[in-house]
């Protein structure tokens, strides 16, 4: 079967986008997702995104995300920006703002006149059981309004914030994000048994109260050039700990995101993420068996 696709990226976090809205697509197996995402023998991507018809009232589209390991995940902020650019560029909507169904609810995506996309990422969740994170038997340490949890990582105790942005995140503050051994500690944190669904590991260096450098080791994808939900989780943790003030410029290896959150006044407030969305090329590929 021939499969039309669009290759896109948001701040270097790259995606294969498939249109399941105007045409019926067969259910993709994990092996097929891995083959399409393979950078040597496939198209190459951190994630595969599916555009589908919504199944809930009030949504314009349904947005599904598969990591390059073949597993379906809850959310991807950089992918969300590419999603709205895709549906507008392909004539699926003329709206500047669209409401999109994801696993944990409905989010709003808005295309700005300057070509950037603003995503209402929803409110963060800090309650360990809802991340989910097993905090049983641990003595947390308060910093500001946040609780830091001790996690043994390769023989060293790391103090982490746990945050859900619809997907789980563990955030730690480091002195130098560029020099930190992200690809050593990242896999250990991702697979720590206290995270029953595994976790995205964020490593944040605070430059000023409005600026950070961030690297994220993503669950099921490894270190990526940018992670939108990871940027939101890091900023939320930093504001909650009293280290950051909104808005925050987040520098990643792939580009810059701007995160705004009124959480110092109301933790139920949604995080707003602004950043680029870019189409790289379009093509047709034979769907692997």
From Swiss-Prot:
Record lineage: Bacteria, Pseudomonadati, Pseudomonadota, Betaproteobacteria, Burkholderiales
Record keywords: Amino-acid biosynthesis, Cytoplasm, Isomerase, Lysine biosynthesis
Site positions per UniProt: Could be important to modulate the pK values of the two catalytic cysteine residues: 169, 218
Principal location listed in the UniProt entry: cytoplasm
Subunit and interaction comment: Homodimer.
Functional summary from the UniProt entry: Catalyzes the stereoinversion of LL-2,6-diaminopimelate (L,L-DAP) to meso-diaminopimelate (meso-DAP), a precursor of L-lysine and an essential component of the bacterial peptidoglycan.
Top-tier EC class: isomerase
Gene that this polypeptide is encoded by: dapF
Recorded GO CC terms: cytosol
Enzyme nomenclature, EC number: 5.1.1.7
Catalysed reactions, as listed in the record: (2S,6S)-2,6-diaminopimelate = meso-2,6-diaminopimelate
Position of the signal peptide: none
Compartment(s) of residence: Cytoplasm
Organism: Burkholderia pseudomallei (strain K96243)
Database matches in PANTHER family: DIAMINOPIMELATE EPIMERASE (PTHR31689:SF0), DIAMINOPIMELATE EPIMERASE, CHLOROPLASTIC (PTHR31689)
GO molecular function: diaminopimelate epimerase activity
Protein name as catalogued: Diaminopimelate epimerase
Domain of life: Bacteria
Single GO biological process annotation from the record: lysine biosynthetic process via diaminopimelate
Keyword field contains Nucleus: no
Active site: 76, 227
Family membership: Belongs to the diaminopimelate epimerase family.
Residues that, per the record, bind substrate: 13, 47, 67, 77-78, 167, 200, 218-219, 228-229
Pathway(s) of this molecule: Amino-acid biosynthesis; L-lysine biosynthesis via DAP pathway; DL-2,6-diaminopimelate from LL-2,6-diaminopimelate: step 1/1
